[in-house]
Amino acid sequence: MSKLRFRVVEKAFHKKPVEVASPATRPSEYFAKYVFNREKMFKYLPSNVYAKLIDVIDNGATLDRSIANAVADGMKKWAIELGVTHYTHWFQPLTEGTAEKHDAFVEHDGKGGMLEEFSGKLLVQQESDGSSFPNGGIRNTFEARGYSAWDPSSPVFVVDDTLCIPTVFIAYTGESLDYKAPLLKALSAVNKAALDVMHYFDPSVKKIISYLGWEQEYFLVDEGLYAARPDLLLTGRTLMGHEASKNQQLEDHYFGAIPSRVAAFMKDLEIQSLELGIPVKTRHNEVAPNQFELAPIYEECNLAVDHNMLVMSLMRKIARNHGFRVLLHEKPFKGVNGSGKHNNWSLGTSTGTLLMAPGKTSEENLRFITFVVNTLMAVYRHNGLLKASIMSATNTHRLGGHEAPPAIISSFLGTQLSKVLDHLEESTNDDLVSLGGKQGMKLDIPQIPELLIDNTDRNRTSPFAFTGNRFEFRAPGSEANCASAMIALNTAVAEQLIEFKKEVDELIEKGEPKISAIIQVVRKCIKECKPIRFDGNGYSDKWKVEAARRGLDCETSCPVIFDNYLKPESIRMFESTGVMTRKELEARNEVKWDMYTKKIQIEARVLGDLVMNHVVPVAIEYQTKLIDNAYKMKSLFSEEEAQTLSAENLAIIKEISEHTSFIKKHVDEMVEARKVANRITSEREKAIAYHDTVAPMLEQIRYHIDKLELIVDDQMWTLPKYRELLFVR
């Protein structure tokens, strides 16, 4: 096995960048080549069908099934011209991945031959086995039926030879079994609630859109090295491995020159993303070695979520073509930064006005303050739920370290906006809001023009920071489906806006002028949500104490954090907005607890296997060599000289015995702890047992393995080390 390690390292050093040819000179020439977008709809659909479908997409009109056959026929013609032979309903089950079943465009022609067929019925709806996906008890093997239904608001696309149709996935009894269905409901709820409030300022606005811009972080590891690490292969992270002497301490990787093999991968990924209509814009090295980031231009939230899921799928496929494996786990390597997926969220009108951006007039600024303060209120009232929406067995390794936001949800606003809110809070009159524009900064360098400085600085320790025209939710993990966080956030904002309008309308009915009523309720909200505002160091221990004093959710146990979904205020929020029922929330929590348990269970099994089949045998083999050396020293030197000369080896022999004894003892205890936990029938209690009794042992055992790695002869160590995983590119 040790020979394999050195063989894959040597092979990795000789790999060359894969040549990637651009399909055209300008990206705009091949953008959305494989997407059935409006341009293709206009070309392949009858004009009346096109108009009805656009009404569904833009205005949320109910899909008229009478046009389904014409739409399906147009899609089929377009797809066949691209060489497509199959179609699939592409959906997002509660596994945090995507699912698809491919069917061919073929049917019997009744004459012994075949013909290409794709009907409106097949486009709009298909049946699937709901019991074979995580469902929290909603579906059983004996009542397994589930349905996937087309989402026209997210365009159909082609991958390889398959037409992919974005769909929702629901049970036969109507409950959602995916992320898309509740996301669409949450977006509908925030549209209606925000539109009602927006009409105070502009009655002509017809629609409010929730926007999302994600930032996807990831690691790349050479495929050979990846294959030689069973823990990476099976869990997505290293369960052992001592830190390399050099990691990220020189701060030389962030924004550094992109390695040639990685650059080729990035170029390939960008081309294929653009061809699928994903507007990728930014690529760069991240902080940790072999860590990188990809970010697109922001899009409508539902489409952005679909595009992120598609990008993660593309990354996995394209990485292999370049001799890499992509790691999307939030913390694949100990001692260096983990990977997140910042969610840049905002609301805007269908005419292009961003509601989270300051305006040019006092009334526009009041509108801006109104939506910002209502967002803060939503985050304050449901800070525990927002934390639950991003929590997982994998993301828990990243949160709370001095590299990512803490596991306490708070919001950073910046100096200027904080002053404005403080002024409004303390003011006793109804003066309208005035905000300054960007300030200039001269650098006194002749070649450099004056810089325009933003009104907000950046606080990297804040989980929910205002960044000028949007809020940046930094807590979501790199592996997660953005929909989870977006469902919670948009629903919370919708509920708050409904409550806000109710209070304003009550004042107006009592004779209060509209602007005065808005300012009074905004002032009340500013006072109430003040505990969520924090501009200081989120990493400090003082903040943990202060956050608890403010009544913020400071829980750190992942399974317990999930309880926030089932709090009365959470159930009331989801049900009142029509996003999810109590039954759906209970089912999703069952899935979350079960998923947590299984991930820790798999890690424990893998670590136990590695210990007994790799680590301990190698340590004993090296120890045997040292013992043999000590015996031979006795035959060459006097007993006193041999004792002196062998003292260091004898100390190492003893140290190896201590480490291996501890490891074997605690692996046995970990197996027993798993057996005890597995007998618990409640998914919640089982997950808590795994968190409290099994997960801590992983770190305890790892400590002793990592000590052995430093002791054992490097030539004998079988598993690729951190210096190879992180620096071989």
Q: Where are the regions that the model predicts?
A:
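Glycine-rich, acidic/polar active-site loops that bind/position phosphate-bearing ligands
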Residues: 143-328, 337-340, 347-590
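N-terminal hydrophobic targeting/anchoring segments and the immediately downstream early-domain regions
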Residues: 2-24, 132, 141-155, 162
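Active-site-proximal loop/turn and secondary-structure-junction residues that shape catalytic pockets
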Residues: 67-71, 91-93, 121-122, 169, ...
